[in-house]
Amino acid sequence: TADGELTLLVRDQSRPNGIALSPDETVLYVANSDADNKVWMAYDLDDSGASNGRVFFDINDQDAPGAADGMKVDRAGHLFATGPGGVWVISPDGVHLGTIMMPEVTANVAWGDDGRTLYMTSSTSLYRIKLTTEGIIPGP
């Protein structure tokens, strides 16, 4: 709240972890890192809080190492989410567009200052890749 009071928004996850906002900040994505329930959730946001919690994308059928973890969005609203095998690219409509395959379990991602370089942390290393899409870089 405006006076600094903590507000509980949802309590329906077993291991919430990474979070990201849609470009218009009306959807909050949350990675559930529970090995028994590997999903990315989506919640609608408005002045009253979060509602309409739903599974945005389910990766429980994936055998590659890794769980739903850190994520970012690009200006088009695509989610770049670390998960089994690497970084999953998912459209705003929940369609898996592809995966940036990684040699190690990937934990988190960040956009570089050019907005087109995606940095990725993994088990023991740091990687980067140049993309054609433009990421959302937090401003002052």
Please place each PLM-identified region on the residue numbering:
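Short loop/turn segments immediately following beta-strands, especially the blade-tip
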Residues: 42-49, 130-138
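Glycine- and Gly-Pro-enriched alpha-helical subdomains that act as flexible
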Residues: 20-53
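A short, acidic, flexible beta-alpha connecting loop/helix-capping segment that sits on the rim
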Residues: 104-106, 115, 122-127, 132-135
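Beta-rich, blade/repeat-based domains predominating
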Residues: 6-30, 59-84, 103-116
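Structural signal for beta-propeller blades
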Residues: 36-40, 87-88, 126-128
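Blade-edge beta-strand/turn elements of extracellular beta-propeller
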Residues: 1-15, 44-64, 88-102
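Short loop/turn segments immediately following the C-termini of beta-strands
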Residues: 33-35, 84, 123, 131
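Short, well-ordered secondary-structure micro-motifs
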Residues: 40-43, 66-69, 83, 92-93
